[in-house]
Amino acid sequence: MVSYKDLGLVNTREMFAKAIKGGYAIPAFNFNNMEQLQAIIKAAAAEKSPVILQVSKGARNYANATLLRYMAQGAVEYAKELGWEKPQIVLHLDHGDSFELCKNCIDFGFSSVMIDGSALPFEKNIELTKKVVEYAHQFDVTVEGELGVLAGVEDEVAHEHHTYTDPEEVIEFAQKTGCDSLAISIGTSHGAYKFTPAQCTRDENGKLVPPPLAFNVLDAVMEKLPGFPIVLHGSSSVPQDEVDTINMFGGKLPDAIGIPEEQLRKAAKSAVCKINIDSDSRLAMTAAVRRVFAEKPAEFDPRKYLGPARDNMEKLYRHKIVNVLGSAGKAE
């Protein structure tokens, strides 16, 4: 058993309370490798923003649980080297699909876990989430539950259709499970194709314009659970400059589209205190790598293409922290 506190990590309880009160959201950035982690920590340290390092089941299998634990511990020390005296860093399991996986992550030093029982019948979701909460809270690990289903594909999570969260269920779910935060579905999606062209309109230049999020559902949830931490998954904006770069240098991402940043800014000022971003960093990384290979086809030193990828991701993360989520300066 490894305690996250011995690794220098924190859970989400205090940072979420501050975020709700302050009208901003904590960035939750997924990572799979060293370059992504370096970019996240450099951005968070530079902007003094609390940050959640997210690891999916697929990323955990890819990177190895033991290595991830030491990477997270190293991230805390790296942040201090960068001048962030008291880093507020969470190591979080994204979309845990079983009690066993959540337990194993807690035992390995994760400070927060998500148990995703959203595809289960309501009572079964409550039962599974409660079981994880009871184990996690013994070690002061925070737990995120989920109600409602997001469409899209990301790692090992795949659903064809949205199921919006039913506001009438949230009180019972929160009370019976004891979860610390709740992921809801209001129209966001996983992956780089969050909406089909048929779901969108087009502007005067022919660019796709995505439909608005269901803020009425969010408002109803907040009315039922005032002051309770809400989470949005699938919240990448799919920057069109990165998509254009990828396509310019041989990629094929036609009609890739995400959540407009103005809608995320609006959400961040509400009880939404955690916003998940994964696809955007993948796009930033891929765009930078493709550019290097196109401009320097003889290059084969990984540092020469992963370095620019890391820098491009850091730029993206800092933009999200400062201009979208409003979390800069909240972890001085």
Regions of interest found by a model, annotated:
Residues 10-21, 34-59, 66-86, 95-229, ...:
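Alpha/beta enzyme core
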Residues 60-64, 264, 273-291, 295-297, ...:
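Shared catalytic-loop signature of beta/alpha-barrel
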Residues 234-237, 257, 277-281:
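Short acidic/histidine-rich active-site segments
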Residues 288-332:
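Extended, intrinsically disordered, low-complexity segments
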